[in-house]
């Protein structure tokens, strides 16, 4: 099955091609030949073939000598994709993914992402911040971004999720980041945004799921605390893992100190996951991911 999608019809000099397909000889040669035919220069390239001969994954960042429309390059690449039954996408390197941030009452991840974005080191276009609390309106306003306060109760959850999806659609949001948003989303919402919603879980999955993982870790006497960034699926905290991080601790750490240590890890792990997604480095492989050049 061949699939592709362009994000823009604008001309560009640099592009990122990502693809996956059944592994067989000749894939790299075919892609390289296509690039040579278009006088393209490979700036960066990574690839991975599953050891059992299953799927092949590739990401190529290349430039062309004259501005070219994405649609034109897509059309020319179609014959290569069809020959190898590729699922693929071509992105203009300068295009930034429209990203919506969501938060509840803990702002360390939100603050970190906004700071990186303001400093120019987070390669996304933030469309706004959604929260079920009004706590971070001032922080959001300081970055001159829209703040959407959507309270959630069991009775209002369907209406709140409808409002959320309306914001996503109206802003053409391509990525949603749950920066410690603590409401459990319905299966319907998870399915609609599958593959484009990232959550940070305050634990090194698959251990210590659910509420108060640091207290669970303290009770177990762990020597490491961590965080996991993963794509959201209808199965809670079971989505494909993008990135994980760890910090060494010892017996002297109280639950409160473990929380403080873990928050630093959470912010770093989430920022890396968002960056890799925005740079088109993360390719899905069933319930796993392949991160090329992360």
Where are these regions (language model features)?
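Short hydrophobic segments within beta-strands
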Residues: 20, 100-102, 130
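Short, glycine-rich nucleotide/cofactor-binding loops
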Residues: 99-109
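Conserved beta-strand segments of alpha/beta enzyme cores
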Residues: 41, 125, 146-148, 196
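Adenosine-nucleotide cofactor-binding segment
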Residues: 141, 145-171
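Donor/substrate-binding cores of folate-linked one-carbon enzymes
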Residues: 133, 156-160, 171-294
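Short internal beta-strands
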Residues: 124-135
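Histidine-anchored nucleotide/phosphate-binding helix
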Residues: 108-119
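A conserved regulatory-domain signal marking ACT and ACT-like small-molecule sensing domains
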Residues: 2-97
């Amino acid at each position: 099955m061949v699939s592709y999608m362009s994000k823009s019809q604008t001309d560009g000099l640099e592009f990122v091609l990502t693809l996956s397909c059944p592994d067989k000889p000749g894939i790299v040669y075919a892609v390289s030949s296509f690039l040579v035919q278009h006088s393209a220069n490979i700036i960066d390239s990574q690839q991975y073939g599953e050891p059992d001969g299953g799927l092949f994954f590739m990401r190529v960042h290349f430039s062309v000598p004259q501005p070219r429309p994405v649609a034109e390059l897509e059309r020319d690449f179609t014959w290569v994709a069809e020959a190898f039954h590729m699922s693929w996408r071509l992105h203009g390197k300068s295009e930034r993914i429209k990203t919506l941030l969501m938060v509840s009452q803990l702002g360390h991840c939100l603050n970190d992402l906004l700071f990186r974005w303001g400093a120019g080191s987070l390669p996304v276009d933030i469309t706004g911040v959604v929260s079920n609390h009004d706590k971070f309106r001032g922080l959001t306003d300081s970055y001159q971004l829209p703040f959407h306060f959507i309270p959630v109760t069991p009775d209002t959850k369907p209406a709140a999720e409808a409002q959320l999806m309306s914001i996503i659609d109206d802003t053409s949001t391509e990525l949603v980041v749950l920066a410690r948003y603590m409401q459990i989303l319905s299966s319907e919402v998870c399915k609609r945004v599958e593959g484009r919603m990232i959550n940070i879980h305050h634990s090194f999955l698959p251990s210590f799921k659910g509420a108060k993982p640091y207290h669970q870790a303290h009770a177990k006497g762990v020597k490491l605390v961590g965080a996991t960034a993963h794509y959201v699926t209808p199965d809670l905290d079971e989505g494909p893992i993008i990135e994980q991080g760890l910090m060494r601790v010892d017996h002297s750490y109280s639950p409160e100190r473990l929380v403080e240590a873990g928050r630093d890890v959470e912010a770093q792990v989430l920022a890396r996951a968002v960056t890799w997604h925005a740079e088109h480095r993360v390719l899905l492989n069933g319930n796993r991911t392949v991160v090329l050049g992360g």
